[in-house]
Curated annotation (Swiss-Prot):
Residues 1-29, 70-97 are annotated as: Disordered. This is Coiled-coil and C2 domain-containing protein 2A. It holds the Pfam family CC2D2AN-C2. InterPro entries: C2_dom, C2_domain_sf, CC2D2AN-C2, CEP76_C, CEPT76/DRC7_peptidase-like_dom, Tectonic-like_complex_comp. The lineage of its organism: Eukaryota, Metazoa, Ecdysozoa, Arthropoda, Hexapoda. Expressed in the antennae of chordotonal neurons and male germ cells (at protein level). It comes from Drosophila melanogaster. Residues 755-915 form the C2 domain. Its main location: cytoplasm. The gene is Cc2d2a. It comes from the Eukaryota. Probable component of the tectonic-like complex (also named MKS complex), a complex localized at the transition zone of primary cilia. Required for ciliary structure and function.
Length: 1336
């Protein structure tokens, strides 16, 4: 069955018969193949192998070449008419037709009837001469076939913009290797070109990478944009799409494709008209090709115009959609803005004429093309009809094109592609809004998006080369970087560019890596800058993706565009090198190692041994690299140079010898990276605790201020017309009460009193960080109780005891002799600026003088204190060897000071009255002017003699702190019930009618550290006591007062420190040990509640802290009321005129809040009967009790302080180093013989300050020192303050001016004692003493 099927198929197979001419040409080809068999060099090839190579050898190569050449040839084929693009690129085997010579040929009937013309000019005859220069020994030996193959491959390489491969030349040349000998003579050639020399240092061959070539890679980062982000909104998506469309629109307008196509179309039409005018029979194909090119250009022009018009329409639609979205959502979070430039045609008739002319030209051209197509089809149909003999049916003739349909079709295409003559010209451009004028707003809500910071790291082939700055993410989810990074490349060029995207945390110094962006670098010095848009997506999340816009360029370092471009050097293959280079000569026969004739040893030939090669850098090395890195002096110098180690950062001298370097503290490894802040190693733990606590409180204030400002802006609405009163609140604009108050305010007028603080919804004020010049004025009137010099008093006491009389009869004479030996003067200083008053005399001096101090600084830098210091001018008579030479030496001894925080003065503008100077506990060389030391009369009869030094003054600053924006605490969320808030609003309206001054009103709802508002009474809650003040301890009240007074105060001009600011709870305060002055009163009042005392919190104004809190408590033994200042720990009686509390606003208890409605402003004249309704206004009633508890942490656990021995040594060294540095012109001598005695005195000072209740017992210590060391003239004092950092200690010592003693024999001694409380609250005690030996 299968055999029958095969025979049937064999019978049906039709063979192709060849003609006689074909067989003749085939025989000639076979004969040529046989003739060239012996000429093929190398291994013999049989006919079968040649046939396989002919039919199948080029299929793989042609396929690869076609894959790479499709894109290159496509555009050139289209420009040439599109004919080449339609031709298939097949291998020779695919174009071969198998012809059987035995079968007769089948010919078409029409083939013999057509007339054929032969044009000899169209025949291709390959040339037998080389078309390029080939460096060979003898070109005449090349055969014609080799020359034709070389020309063919040369043309193929030119079409691919490449070079002819050297390996192919070696295969086709077939030259014998040249025979020549290597000569030792060198000849100098002449070359007119001067080459630039390159320094090439010696190096091993394994490290050789090529000639040193210095190139510069300029990488510019333009923009970072997020397309996917957790904060992405619909407006972001539309704005990014619109921006991408506008970029495409701008690129099209910049390239002007339609204009260029229009010009090319006009040129093609002119060429076609000329060809048609002078066309002959031999130029028909050229005319057809030109007409075809014209048609393709017109179609491409229509397509580009339509695409550009559609893009413009889409751009306008998207822009309208974005504007509608912004209008509906009532906020804008992107900056993208577009503008339209509409230009109407100036002359409609000219526009119509141009449009009509263009349309008629295209219509005629299209109609001619349709006619040509019609006539071609008609001719083919006619020929087919005339020659068709076997066809049974006749096909219909082609129909002539209808002009109306063609015109309608072209008109429809014109409407889609081009604009109407009456349509105006529309151009879209982008509006670049300035940062200052950009009006961006974000949607309101409780949870606002946090600020995110990002930066980029650049890597070239895995090597880090640069990093961008840190930028904050804008509301439009874009970051404008605009940074350029230059990389100097030597020898090797990078291949890949990697960019890592990092997110920087706002609270910690760590950063989080988000995404990696990789792209290959196309580096070519001949091209322009390469612009790229790189997309990325986060590694850990799919909700973060975006694009990075950048461009880079590669140029020589000698100049941009000035260097000559060198050709690429192609390395010859090994096969060609063996062919072109001569073979090596045969080696000479080696001589025998043993000589033929034996000779004595002295006659043997000595082999010359060459010295070993040593590089120059090795000869210049003093020692090995490992030895250098292990050297301790090099480690010190390297660590000091890096400025990273705090131990070596301030070294001024490094010993030259290694044995002179002490090994007390190990140095870090210089080859590793050292962290700047490492707790316990480079910073003292207490310093680190203080530093972190200060940063925590500053960050807390910044976060709450930012949150309140955003909430206030989001909730800002137009104020109602009922709010006519200037001091009214926003919540009072509702109800009948507000309507009645509005009518009253219209008829009665407004009060002229200014509010104490601006309202929470006031407009935007000027920035507080502008540079300003301040003038501080101090009018000092008089002082009482100034200490006097003790040696005069001792002499007077001896005189009194020797006389044995009663000095009460001559009290005036006694006071004149005792208290006139001191010459005090007052100084006003801030930082390094100082001004002083004139010198007065006596213990009760009077100056009545005004001092002015100019301060030039910014608000952010005003953190120091204004110091009002009291000095004694001591004049000593100095005698020389000659009796006629007498001169004086003036020495200033510090007696005390009064510190005014600059932020309080800026907020209050003025301070006046009587203040108490902070005097040292022990003042050696001086004594208090107590009346009981010279007479037996009671002290009550002489009120001018007190234990404290008082100063009457008036202090002011111009300009004040009016530019500080208030904290919008009213916009924060409230934790109280709405009913309570409404009740407080009603009570506030009643209270404002009774207050004598509107400044007395304090908002009862305050902001806590959690960012929410609560009632003031919730802050009053018993909290755990410090460990030293447990009820079983001795006098726990005094210990609590002392502990609170040692907490650190934050000195900054910040509205968060006021009554409408942030109130801290006990956990935030005690963990950070930093707070404002008002927070100290809350903590002390809670301590008293834990002790079971009856106490209240007083809110008012004091000198020098401004708005602060005092504590009013009742002593259990005597039921007497006392006022306690939490900042200083001093207690005052209610009638004490020297109490620093100036005004009282309200009294806060655990059960109620009482507002002061008394007309009397003096505290000493204020009635403190809280049940008297005529003096105090209770905020809560029985039916509406005050809310309690919920803020303080009732189970707070205190932490134990760190070891203080190391810190005490650091403080002592710091003081000695600073005093020695300040005395640059004098030698500083330290006498350590006094130090044990001073330490013993300081150990008793803490208990004396805690339990003495403000009394001064320093005569005991000062007189003991003077008696123990009678051969020295002593002057010294003690300083006590809370520890913050070492810089604050240096500033206090510099203010005392103890280092200004210019006596040649003066000696100094310093003693330091630290008393630790819980949570690293330290009390620092310093004893500074200067002594001058007395000459007998």
């Amino acid at each position: 069955m299968e055999a029958a099927l095969s025979r049937k198929t064999a019978k049906k197979k039709r063979k192709t018969h060849t003609t006689r001419g074909y067989r003749k040409r085939e025989q000639e080809v076979q004969k040529l193949i046989r003739a060239t068999e012996g000429r093929i060099s190398g291994p013999e090839h049989d006919m079968e192998a040649l046939s396989l190579q002919f039919f199948h050898g080029f299929e793989g190569e042609m396929q690869q070449e076609n894959d790479f050449a499709v894109e290159d040839c496509q555009e050139s084929d289209e420009d040439s008419g599109g004919e080449l693009a339609e031709e298939p690129t097949d291998s020779p085997s695919q174009t071969f037709i198998h012809i059987d010579l035995h079968d007769p040929p089948l010919a078409w009937g029409q083939l013999f009837k057509q007339r054929h013309y032969y044009d000899e000019s169209l025949l291709y005859r390959p040339s037998n001469t080389l078309h390029f220069q080939l460096h060979l020994s003898d070109l005449s030996e090349l055969k014609d076939s080799q020359i034709r193959m070389l020309n063919r491959y040369q043309e193929q390489s030119k079409s691919k913009s490449g070079k002819l491969g050297s390996d192919l030349i070696g295969q086709l040349s077939g030259q014998k290797p040249a025979s020549f000998l290597m000569g030792k003579h060198l000849y100098r050639s002449v070359c007119h070109r001067r080459f630039q020399s390159v320094f090439f240092p010696p190096m091993p061959p394994s490290e050789l990478k090529g000639l040193p070539s210095r190139r510069c890679l300029k990488l510019c980062l333009k923009q970072l944009r997020f397309s996917l982000h957790p904060q992405l909104l619909e407006e972001h998506r539309l704005a990014q799409q619109l921006e991408d469309l506008f970029d495409v629109y701008s690129q099209q307008r910049k390239q002007r494709i339609c204009r260029k196509l229009r010009e090319e179309l006009e040129i093609a039409r002119q060429v076609a008209l000329k060809l048609l005018a002078s066309a002959g029979q031999d130029q028909t194909a050229e005319v057809k090709r030109q007409l075809k090119l014209t048609r393709q250009l017109r179609q491409r022009y229509y397509a580009e115009s339509a695409a550009q018009r559609n893009l413009l329409q889409r751009l306008l639609k998207e822009w309208a959609k974005l504007k509608e979205l912004r209008r509906q959502q009532r906020f804008q979070c992107t900056r993208f803005q577009l503008g339209l430039r509409v230009v109407h045609p100036p002359d409609l008739e000219a526009s119509y004429c141009a449009w009509k002319e263009s349309f008629e030209t295209d219509l005629a051209e299209v109609y001619r093309e349709h006619l040509e197509l019609f006539y071609t089809r008609l001719r083919l149909w006619t020929d087919q009809k005339s020659h068709s003999r076997t066809a049974t049916g006749h096909s219909k003739p082609p129909r002539k094109p209808q002009f109306d349909r063609i015109m309608a079709s072209l008109r429809k295409e014109y409407d889609k592609t081009f604009k109407d003559p009456e349509e105006p010209y529309v151009e879209v451009f982008r509006l670049h809004a300035d940062e200052a004028t950009a009006r961006l707003s974000i949607p309101g809500g409780d949870q606002l998006p946090k600020a995110r910071n990002y930066f980029l790291k650049i890597f070239l082939d895995g090597q880090f080369v640069g990093q961008s700055r840190t930028y904050r993410l804008e509301p439009d989810l874009q970051i404008s970087i605009n940074e350029c990074i230059g990389v100097l490349l030597e020898r090797s060029l990078p291949e890949n560019l990697n960019i890592w995207l990092y997110e920087k945390s706002t609270l910690t110094p760590k950063s989080r890596r988000l995404a990696q962006i990789s792209t290959p670098l196309v580096l070519s010095s001949k091209d322009d800058a390469v612009q790229e848009k790189l997309s990325f997506q986060a590694l850990s999340s799919t909700q973060l993706a975006g694009d990075v816009y950048l461009y880079y360029e590669y140029r020589s370092t000698e100049g941009w565009g000035s260097a000559l471009h060198l050709d690429d050097v192609q390395r010859l293959p090994d096969a060609l090198r063996q062919t072109l280079l001569p073979q090596s000569l045969p080696a000479l026969p080696q001589a025998s190692k043993e000589l033929v004739t034996p000779r004595p040893p002295s006659g043997r030939i000595k082999k010359s041994q060459l010295p070993s090669l040593i590089f120059a850098e090795q000869q210049l090395q003093f020692c090995g690299l490992d030895v250098l890195l292990d050297n301790r002096r090099f480690q010190l110098l390297h660590s000091r140079h890096q400025q990273r180690n705090l131990h070596t950062k301030q070294l001024r001298f490094v010993p030259a010898l290694e044995q002179e370097i002490s090994e007390e503290e190990p140095l870090p490894d210089g080859r590793g990276t050292v962290q700047l802040l490492e707790p316990g190693t480079y910073w003292n733990p207490i310093d680190l605790h203080k530093h972190r606590g200060r940063k925590f409180l500053q960050l807390l204030y910044e976060v709450i201020a930012s949150q309140s400002a955003r909430r206030a802006k989001a909730l800002q609405t137009p104020l109602p017309l009922l709010l006519l009163a200037e001091d009214s609140d926003r919540s009072s604009g509702t109800g009948w009460t507000a309507l009645w108050r509005a009518f009253c305010s219209v008829f009665q007028g407004q009060r002229n009193s200014l509010p104490r603080e601006p309202s929470g919804w006031s407009g935007h004020q000027s920035a507080p960080d502008l540079f300003k010049s301040f003038c501080v004025s101090l009018h000092v009137v008089r002082a009482t109780g100034v200490p006097v010099r003790s040696r005069h008093i001792l002499n007077l006491n001896e005189r009194r005891s020797s006389a044995g009389g009663d000095m009460s009869t001559s009290l005036f004479v006694t006071q004149t002799l005792m208290y006139s030996n001191v010459r005090p003067f007052v100084t006003l200083s801030y930082g390094q600026r100082l001004c002083r008053s004139r010198t007065a005399e006596g213990s009760n001096p009077t100056w009545n003088e005004q001092l002015q101090l100019q301060i030039q600084s910014q608000f952010g830098d005003l953190r120091d204190d204004l110091k009002i210091s009291l000095f004694d001018e001591l004049i000593e008579q100095q005698y020389s060897d000659e009796a006629s030479d007498v001169y004086q030496r003036v020495q200033c001894n510090w007696l005390g000071e009064f510190r005014v925080p600059i932020n309080s003065l800026l907020a209050s503008r003025t301070f006046e009255g009587c203040i108490e100077l902070a005097m040292p506990k022990v003042l050696v060389g001086y004594k208090r002017p107590l009346i009981d030391s010279v007479t037996n009369m009671p002290t009550d009869q002489y009120p001018e003699f007190k234990e404290a030094v008082h100063l009457w003054f008036y202090l002011s600053i111009e300009p004040g702190g009016g530019d500080l924006a208030p904290l919008h605490s009213c916009a924060l969320a409230c934790a109280e019930k709405p009913e309570l808030q409404q009740y407080l609003d009603e009570r506030r309206l009643e209270l404002q009618q009774l207050l004598p001054q509107p400044q007395r009103y304090v908002e009862p709802l305050v902001c806590t550290a959690q960012g929410k508002r609560v009632c003031l009474t919730r802050l009053m809650d018993p909290v755990p006591l410090p460990p030293a003040a447990v009820p079983s301890g001795e006098n726990p009240l005094e210990i609590c007062i002392r502990y609170v007074s040692l907490l650190s105060h934050l000195r900054s001009y910040d509205p968060c420190q006021g009554f409408r600011g942030v109130w801290l709870d006990n956990q935030s305060l005690l963990d950070s040990t930093w707070c404002s002055v008002k927070d100290l009163g809350v903590l002390l009042c809670n301590y008293m509640l834990s002790l079971g005392l009856e106490c209240w919190l007083i809110l008012g104004v004091s000198c020098p802290h401004g708005e602060c809190s005092f504590v009013l408590f009742r002593q259990p033994e005597t039921a007497e009321l006392f006022l306690v200042s939490p900042a200083t720990g001093k207690r005052y009686q209610l009638q004490d005129v020297h109490c620093p509390l100036r005004r009282i606003y309200c009294v806060v208890g655990k059960q109620n809040i009482y507002f002061n409605i008394q007309t009397e402003t003096r505290v000493s004249m204020t009635h403190f009967n809280l049940q008297d309704g005529a003096c105090w206004f209770p905020l809560f009633r029985r039916r509406v009790p005050a809310p309690q508890s919920g803020v303080q942490k009732l189970d707070y656990a205190y932490k134990r302080s760190y070891e203080l021995s190391q810190l005490q040594k650091h403080i002592e060294r710091k003081i000695m180093k600073k005093i020695s540095a300040w005395r640059t012109t004098r030698k500083t001598i330290w006498n350590r013989a006094f130090q044990p005695r001073l330490h013993k005195i300081l150990c008793d000072m803490e208990d004396l300050s805690t339990f003495s209740r403000g009394r001064y017992d320093e005569p005991i210590f000062s007189e003991q020192l003077e008696r123990e060391f009678p051969n020295y003239r002593l002057y010294g004092f003690t300083l006590n303050f809370a520890y913050t950092n070492l810089a604050a200690i240096s500033e206090r010592i510099r203010t005392s001016c103890i280092h200004y003693n210019h006596d040649a024999s003066v000696e100094f001694c310093v003693a330091v004692h630290l008393h630790a409380h819980a949570n690293d609250v330290l009390s620092v005690w310093l004893f500074l003493l200067s002594m001058v030996p007395l000459v007998e």
